[in-house]
Amino acid sequence: MQIAVLLSGGVDSSVALYIMIQKGYKNIKCYYLKIWLEDELSYIGECPWKEDINYVEAVCKKFNVPYEIISLQDEYYKRVVTYAIEELKIGNTPSPDIFCNQRIKFGAFFDKINEHYDLIVTGHYAKIENKNDHYILKQAKDKIKDQSYFLSHLSRKQISKLHFPLGDLLKTEIRQIAQKIDLPNKNRKDSQGICFLGKIKYDEFIKYHLGELKGNIIEQETGKILGTHNGYWFFTIGQRKGIKLSHGPWFVTEKDIQNNIIYISNSINYLKQGKQQFLVHKTNWINKPLNNGDLSAKIRHGEKKIKCKIEMLKNDIIKVDLEEKDYGISPGQFCIFYQEDECLGGAKILKTLT
């Protein structure tokens, strides 16, 4: 069996490689996907991916496996970064990591490698089950680290080639393994945020591409101008961080894109702003829901799932009715559907209702 392992330089993918070797697999080649955007990195004066490469090289040397660096920067910019920028321009909240998995790690990478591989192994926190050639994507044992949300837009064909060795392990167990086998990167911190940013702050990335534009911050209930902001594209519905005003905490409740206005509400009135119903479109079903199964949804990456009902409307639009209110539903985000711990797929949020 020919196996490709995607290494990031982090602990998770390195432990995934170790597990495959421990299981007796021999024909393994590792790949590092270079998707760093050089223009965005120029002002921080260093190349963060070089540290990744050093760790990848050290891990592969330890286990005596070959590795190759594959540059996917052009593909990443065209298929993911451009999408994120266009969504921000129209006031939506993009989810770049979903498309990074669908279009790059398991899209462009699949297209790029000439060798034939029976299995692609990564350090994602998720599970894949195969029941008579029927592939199921499931949540990981570690529900806090679970990444099924970001894998929800893969096709069944993509899933059929994947294996996630960490799906039945907790993060603490993975750290213990790394220490026990003395991995070169055993003490390396986990990466945070969007896959391509690394040391770049998200707001800095947005500023680089969209600049700044002064606008008013208005209290939702009174219409009173409370302050100014640097552009609606820096904010998302439900956001609290970054609103530096007294008498808070304040939360974003609405964005007026035409007039570059951010509406906010304080903690008391904010609780009245929650939504339970919204429309989604552009659905990707890995497996369609069973009629007799309870359905739940994730509006964002994290542990929380909310029970819901769905109604199929015209033009492939789906109405979602949550069992409880959510306070951060924003167009452009993705709603991912689950039955128990199976990830069925997901859809892009079109607009909120009530």
Swiss-Prot record:
CDD domains: MnmA_TRMU-like. The active site is at 100 (nucleophile), 195 (cysteine persulfide intermediate). InterPro entries: MnmA-like, MnmA-like_C, MnmA-like_central, MnmA-like_central_sf, Rossmann-like_a/b/a_fold, tRNA_2-thiouridylase_MnmA. Its main location: cytoplasm. Its EC number is 2.8.1.13. The record marks 124, 333 as: Interaction with tRNA. Disulfide bonds join 100-195. One of its GO terms (biological process) is tRNA modification. It is found in: Cytoplasm. The keyword RNA-binding applies. GO terms for molecular function: ATP binding; tRNA binding; tRNA-uridine 2-sulfurtransferase activity. Keywords: ATP-binding, Cytoplasm, Disulfide bond, Nucleotide-binding, RNA-binding, Transferase, tRNA processing, tRNA-binding. NCBIfam families: PRK00143.1, trmU. Catalyzes the 2-thiolation of uridine at the wobble position (U34) of tRNA, leading to the formation of s(2)U34. Belongs to the MnmA/TRMU family. This is tRNA-specific 2-thiouridylase MnmA.
